[in-house]
């Protein structure tokens, strides 16, 4: 039997002072000696993905208490990338992942919690909590706040608009074809409910990946934030974590710990899912970071290999008019995993917080397995309510029928895949010897080969300026550098540049490469995570206006057509300059907090985690 971590503060004469303080928090006499479960919430009124979580912690806590645990709740910070987008606030987004991970570690270790339920949702919160879970390696269950419903709009000329989302609104703001009244209609409908933004953007991608990693319950990634069916997920999470405590502390079963569940094979399955669902490029960054925190031997080379063999089975906004509610109707993540499993593309010897084997897990939850439980079938009938609300569990609408069309539906089988390669591709070449990433699911295959002259800028702000002033021309490659983890610092998302290119009619006529990153809502020929970054001496820092840049997605190449000798001459000149590997004439306030992150941040190929050894 393994002693509870909390025993040091709850048992024995030496713990009298700590017990006195526990009593002051409401702990009862009969609760001492039971596992203390940290309810790691992330409620905030700043973020639609978290605005409905205030009372959710109580639901989880009640379930923990009924199952025999002692729940204690605390909150982490949560940054809304959409609100932070396009100004200095975005510098703080990625570093907030590390702050979240640190704060969870600090609270859990300082108070000797025995286990966690992580109530996450948006872009950096799930990854931050995941990093903490992999560090701490104590029993954990993830349960997110759920996706937002897609918006519905009718533009002023009476033409029905496709389902809308945040990206629709941003792109429309840069389009001359959309007047102010039309823009207002899109804006008013783009984000109609609480929840994480409704497409396969970063937040939803990561919440789906926790299912594949085995750390969350089926339906976690796709059940809408507004649907009453989501309440059962929170209740089950609280019940499950206490069972995991029993198995670990009572039976010494280390297989139920995060590192026992999220093994290398589980990481491979998660990235296979990511390729199949065309997830956000940010998922690569966050999965690499989680692997590093958990000391899992999984790196960019493994992801590259997976992308060569795993087909793209689903295209969801921003790459189509499908949204997360449509993914859910098609069976959610279990249906995608089921198709991959039938295609022989998953490791079978993995388990999860809710199942001891993959086959049983998918038999029960994949609506196409032929063995689906009634509970699973009922869950995936959960449909959007279609009304504006910030309230969780506010609708009980049901789909009349599920989407099981494996040929043309939201989730396809391997035979009817969109592409044979995965939806995410790693590119290498003299610009990115350590790798760069493109969301191939977001571009038509005829654009997979692109060559054009470079238009070099040294900040996101300058990139936006050259687009909106129509300085950039069709056929050019916009190079945005010094926006990496150290160079930014903070590796800003380039959502505004990509959305404005699209809104300006250049989304299929220009390419963009950067050592920064992209929002999960970005689409088009957008290549990010260029490593090494400019601030670390990467070749992207040596590109000059007019240099010919070639992109070959089929052959996974990213090159600048400049000789090695000329690149070395430029490198020597850069090293001899007064301020080498720094942006020229960039006016940006970088605080001490950001400088601290910049000093320790690795490039994107290492997940942009901090290197402190």
Curated annotation (Swiss-Prot):
Catalytic activity: (2R)-2,3-dihydroxy-3-methylbutanoate = 3-methyl-2-oxobutanoate + H2O; (2R,3R)-2,3-dihydroxy-3-methylpentanoate = (S)-3-methyl-2-oxopentanoate + H2O
Gene Ontology CC terms: cytosol
Stored PROSITE patterns: ILVD_EDD_1, ILVD_EDD_2
GO biological process: isoleucine biosynthetic process; L-valine biosynthetic process
Entry's cofactor comment: Binds 1 [2Fe-2S] cluster per subunit. This cluster acts as a Lewis acid cofactor.
Record: active site: 519
Keywords: 2Fe-2S, Amino-acid biosynthesis, Branched-chain amino acid biosynthesis, Iron, Iron-sulfur, Lyase, Magnesium, Metal-binding
Modified residues (N6-carboxylysine): 124
GO molecular function, one term: magnesium ion binding
Binding sites annotated in the UniProt record for [2Fe-2S] cluster: 122, 197
Requisite cofactors: [2Fe-2S] cluster; Mg(2+)
EC number: 4.2.1.9
Highest rank taxon of the organism: Bacteria
Residues the entry annotates as binding Mg(2+): 81, 123-124, 493
Pfam families found in the cross-reference section: ILV_EDD_C, ILVD_EDD_N
Pathway as given in its UniProt record: Amino-acid biosynthesis; L-isoleucine biosynthesis; L-isoleucine from 2-oxobutanoate: step 3/4; Amino-acid biosynthesis; L-valine biosynthesis; L-valine from pyruvate: step 3/4
NCBIfam families: ilvD, PRK12448.1
Similarity comment: Belongs to the IlvD/Edd family.
Its job: Functions in the biosynthesis of branched-chain amino acids. Catalyzes the dehydration of (2R,3R)-2,3-dihydroxy-3-methylpentanoate (2,3-dihydroxy-3-methylvalerate) into 2-oxo-3-methylpentanoate (2-oxo-3-methylvalerate) and of (2R)-2,3-dihydroxy-3-methylbutanoate (2,3-dihydroxyisovalerate) into 2-oxo-3-methylbutanoate (2-oxoisovalerate), the penultimate precursor to L-isoleucine and L-valine, respectively.
PANTHER family reported for this sequence: D-XYLONATE DEHYDRATASE, D-XYLONATE DEHYDRATASE YAGF-RELATED
Oligomer status and interactors: Homodimer.
Protein name as it appears in the record: Dihydroxy-acid dehydratase
Species per Swiss-Prot/TrEMBL record: Corynebacterium glutamicum (strain R)
């Amino acid at each position: 039997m393994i002693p509870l971590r909390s025993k040091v503060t709850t048992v024995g004469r030496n713990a009298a002072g700590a017990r006195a303080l526990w009593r002051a928090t409401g702990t009862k006499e009969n609760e001492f000696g039971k596992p203390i479960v940290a309810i790691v919430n992330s409620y905030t009124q700043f973020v639609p993905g978290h605005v409905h979580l205030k009372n959710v912690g109580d639901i989880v806590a009640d379930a923990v208490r009924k199952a025999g645990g002692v729940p204690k709740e605390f909150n982490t910070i949560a940054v809304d990338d959409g609100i932070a987008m396009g100004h200095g606030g975005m510098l703080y987004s990625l570093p907030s992942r590390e702050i979240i991970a640190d704060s969870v570690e600090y609270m859990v270790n300082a108070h000797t919690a025995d286990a966690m339920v992580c109530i996450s949702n948006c872009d950096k919160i799930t990854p931050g909590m995941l990093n903490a879970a992999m560090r701490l390696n104590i029993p954990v269950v993830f349960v997110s706040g759920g996706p937002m419903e897609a918006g519905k709009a009718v533009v002023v000329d009476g033409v029905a608009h496709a389902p809308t989302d945040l990206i629709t609104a941003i792109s429309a703001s840069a389009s001359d074809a959309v007047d102010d009244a039309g823009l207002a209609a899109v804006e008013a409908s783009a984000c109609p409910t609480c929840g994480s933004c409704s497409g396969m953007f970063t937040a939803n991608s990561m919440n789906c990946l926790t299912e594949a990693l085995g750390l969350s319950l089926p339906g976690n990634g796709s059940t809408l934030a507004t649907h009453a069916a989501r309440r059962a997920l929170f209740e089950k999470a609280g019940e499950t974590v206490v069972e995991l405590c029993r198995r670990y502390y009572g039976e010494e079963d280390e297989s139920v710990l995060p590192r026992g569940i999220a093994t290398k094979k589980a990481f491979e399955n998660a990235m296979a899912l990511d390729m199949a669902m065309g997830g956000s490029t940010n998922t690569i960054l966050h999965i690499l970071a989680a692997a590093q925190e958990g000391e899992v031997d999984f790196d960019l080379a493994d992801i590259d290999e997976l992308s060569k063999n795993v087909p793209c089975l689903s295209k969801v906004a921003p790459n189509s008019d499908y949204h997360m509610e449509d993914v859910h109707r098609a069976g959610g993540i279990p249906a995608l995993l089921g198709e991959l499993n039938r295609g022989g593309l998953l490791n079978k010897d993995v388990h999860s917080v809710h199942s001891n084997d993959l086959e049983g897990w998918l038999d029960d939850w994949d609506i196409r397995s032929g063995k689906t439980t009634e509970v699973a079938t009922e869950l995936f009938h959960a449909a959007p309510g279609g009304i504006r609300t910030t309230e969780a569990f506010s609708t009980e609408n049901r789909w009349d029928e599920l989407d099981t069309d494996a040929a043309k539906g939201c989730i396809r089988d391997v035979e009817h895949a969109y592409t044979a390669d995965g939806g995410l591709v790693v590119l290498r070449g003299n610009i990115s010897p350590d790798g760069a990433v493109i969301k191939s699911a977001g571009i038509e295959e005829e654009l997979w080969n692109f060559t054009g002259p470079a238009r070099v800028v040294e900040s996101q702000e300058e990139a936006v300026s050259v687009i909106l002033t129509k300085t950039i021309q069709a056929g050019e490659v916009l190079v945005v550098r010094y926006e990496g983890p150290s160079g930014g610092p903070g590796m800003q998302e380039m959502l505004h540049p990509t959305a404005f290119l699209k809104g300006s009619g250049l989304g299929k006529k220009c390419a963009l490469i950067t050592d920064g990153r992209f929002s999960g809502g970005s689409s088009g020929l957008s290549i990010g995570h260029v490593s090494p970054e400019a601030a670390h001496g990467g070749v992207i820092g040596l590109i000059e206006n007019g240099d010919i840049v070639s992109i070959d997605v089929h052959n996974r190449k990213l090159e600048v057509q400049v000789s090695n000798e000329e690149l070395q001459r430029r490198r020597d000149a850069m090293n001899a300059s007064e301020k080498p590997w720094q942006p020229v004439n960039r006016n940006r306030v970088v605080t001490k907090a950001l400088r601290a992150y910049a000093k320790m941040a690795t490039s994107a190929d290492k997940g942009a985690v901090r290197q402190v050894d």
